[in-house]
């Protein structure tokens, strides 16, 4: 980055500080990961100079013969990884992908079933503060109060009662496997389209460590970062019968020119999906999550649903007498990065919360395994237990830096 350093030292300095933060911190935000250097390089290419409205072979600009090659590579790799009939790799984000699906199949005011944000859903699944909840009539489904798992009987009952045009299955903070077969049966019963938002678990689904929603859903959306370990972006996978509607909804419906440099980075990331090393990585993500969850349980923490089937867990901090916001700030002081997160029926405000969400994808990318997860649980517990002891917090921070130094980011 010599040119950047010379031309804009202020921005360069901020980027370098972020590099250092990523290197020294234990990154436990479930939606974050570290992309391979090849993905970084692809995202920083001259493809950012090229406008390419339209699709390969059908562009509104000349000079697209090489970006067509790149987009086709990305499409074919994603299709192969999930066994999809059609894909669109142009959405700029997961939110844009969800928006495009709604735009393709719904009219303003149409009824949709989506998971309640307060119980693990996503903003774009019908939150009243989001465009989705303001544009469409979202009916929220939630969790069984006893098991804290999705109440599929409630989903079926709400579907029969409200006859939604679309049912959304997916989450941002739910640690268990979704029953895609049951969701599809409910959708068929009421004549609804089933959309699965697999943003969080896409990498696990591509490698057999989570059910593949493409087998049951009419349409699937995803981000391309998180467990896919690619650039920030989105994608849509669907049945061939919906290809025209989806493509028209993305362009010209929701977006103009695609980000061809990011599509190149997506293509590189999708190449991982057929790599045995990546499959082993996804398996380790799940093993690490189970190990970290068990270690926290053994230290007296309550986990929503009692554990995890995927890459994340939701920790209820009320028994420890600390809010999610305060825990996030506390752990940040010792170089452990988490995010505050509401727990089911959380009595605290959304910017305070009673819990934190923890995920294992990022530190698994750096090579950590079960033993390190136990160590991380111990560091978290010691920080929370001794949160008013500055000397102990200093010792914990030093131990964190010693641990991360053993697993360097971009070692070469």
From Swiss-Prot:
| Catalytic activity reported | (6R)-5,10-methylene-5,6,7,8-tetrahydrofolate + glycine + H2O = (6S)-5,6,7,8-tetrahydrofolate + L-serine
Q: Where is this chain's protein located in or outside the cell?
A: Cytoplasm
**Site (Plays an important role in substrate specificity): residue numbering on this chain:** 225
Matching entries from Gene3D superfamilies are given as: Aspartate Aminotransferase, domain 1, Type I PLP-dependent aspartate aminotransferase-like (Major domain)
Protein keywords? Amino-acid biosynthesis, Cytoplasm, One-carbon metabolism, Pyridoxal phosphate, Transferase
Q: What do the Gene Ontology cellular component annotations say?
A: cytosol
Q: Which Pfam families match?
A: SHMT
Cofactors needed by this protein, per the record, are: pyridoxal 5'-phosphate
Q: Name one GO molecular function term.
A: pyridoxal phosphate binding
Tell me if Transcription is a UniProt keyword of this record.
no
Task: Please state the Enzyme Commission number of this protein.
Answer: 2.1.2.1
Matches recorded under HAMAP family: SHMT (MF_00051)
> Quaternary structure?
Homodimer.
Q: What does this protein do?
A: Catalyzes the reversible interconversion of serine and glycine with tetrahydrofolate (THF) serving as the one-carbon carrier. This reaction serves as the major source of one-carbon groups required for the biosynthesis of purines, thymidylate, methionine, and other important biomolecules. Also exhibits THF-independent aldolase activity toward beta-hydroxyamino acids, producing glycine and aldehydes, via a retro-aldol mechanism.
Q: Which family, according to UniProt? A: Belongs to the SHMT family.
Recorded protein name is: Serine hydroxymethyltransferase
Query: What is the organism of origin for this protein?
Result: Symbiobacterium thermophilum (strain DSM 24528 / JCM 14929 / IAM 14863 / T)
Q: List the taxonomic lineage.
A: Bacteria, Bacillati, Bacillota, Clostridia, Eubacteriales
Q: Which gene encodes it?
A: glyA
